[in-house]
């Protein structure tokens, strides 16, 4: 009986085939490993970025609702709400956030507030203890009724003390005028508090501040749009955006 030459381990031809098979297997493994590494390199950054992007979406939705509520208020009263209301002695009572509650379908909460007494008066304790979801960025992880959504209360901004600002004197195009902005958690205030973002906060907010969204912040504009702005936005662009009476137009590619 003739012996199969390929069954002998000492057969040179068999050894060559075995070595070739091992080489091909090694090459296949290296090729697959390289492909997997490439896929990971391409996909991992997007996976890391996805949660940040998803975290911004609910925040932008909140700002959209707040911005549209302010605009709805302005349409009813022919002016933006004042930054705050005051008593006969000029003491601050309530924030514009309280005034727009009916425009946010929070009529019952609004009616429970005694507007003649300060926001933190015992008479308003129930409202004070109420957390309003639309005023809370999910990524900010705040509690106790705190909000990072502040009005543009800079000099010449949309929220001018206790005096409502007429829409008619607000600069056009409205897409270039900042209305409401999200600030760092360190600047958070109670949603009922008559406090907002002054010029110092708006002009100096930068990468050193701990924004809820890395490197960016969300902002609502007078035209009703909500956009994401870089925390490194140039100072002259910031000044133009916070001015409700400015005449200088800005190229939309600049912000």
PLM region descriptions:
Residues 1-17:
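N-terminal intrinsically disordered, acidic low-complexity segments at the extreme N-terminus
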Residues 4, 20-23, 166:
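Positively charged, low-complexity intrinsically disordered regions
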Residues 13, 17-19, 152, 243:
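Residue-level detector of intrinsically disordered, flexible termini
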Residues 17-61, 65-69, 75, 79:
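Amphipathic alpha-helical segments typified by the pilin-like N-terminal helix
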């Amino acid at each position: 009986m003739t012996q199969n030459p390929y069954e002998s381990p000492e057969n040179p031809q068999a050894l060559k085939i075995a070595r070739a098979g091992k080489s091909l297997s090694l090459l296949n493994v290296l090729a697959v490993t390289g492909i997997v590494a490439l896929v990971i390199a391409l996909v991992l950054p997007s996976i890391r970025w996805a949660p940040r992007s998803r975290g911004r979406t609910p925040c932008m939705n909140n700002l959209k609702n707040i911005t549209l509520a302010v605009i709805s208020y302005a349409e009813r009263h022919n002016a933006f709400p004042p930054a705050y209301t005051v008593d006969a002695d000029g003491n601050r009572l309530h924030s514009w956030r309280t005034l727009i509650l009916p425009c946010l379908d929070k009529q019952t909460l609004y009616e429970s507030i005694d507007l003649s007494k300060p926001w933190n008066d015992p008479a308003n304790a129930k409202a004070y203890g109420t957390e309003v979801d639309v005023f809370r960025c999910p990524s900010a992880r705040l509690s106790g009724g705190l909000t990072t959504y502040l009005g543009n209360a800079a000099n010449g901004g949309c929220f001018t003390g206790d005096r409502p600002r007429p829409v008619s004197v607000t600069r056009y195009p409205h897409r270039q005028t900042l209305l409401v902005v999200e600030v760092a958690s360190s600047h958070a205030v109670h949603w009922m508090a008559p406090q907002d973002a002054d010029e110092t906060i708006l002009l100096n907010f930068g990468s050193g501040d701990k924004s809820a969204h890395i490197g960016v912040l969300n902002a609502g504009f007078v035209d009703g749009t909500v956009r994401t702005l870089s925390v490194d936005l140039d100072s002259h662009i910031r000044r133009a955006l916070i001015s409700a009476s400015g005449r200088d137009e800005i190229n939309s590619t600049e912000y």
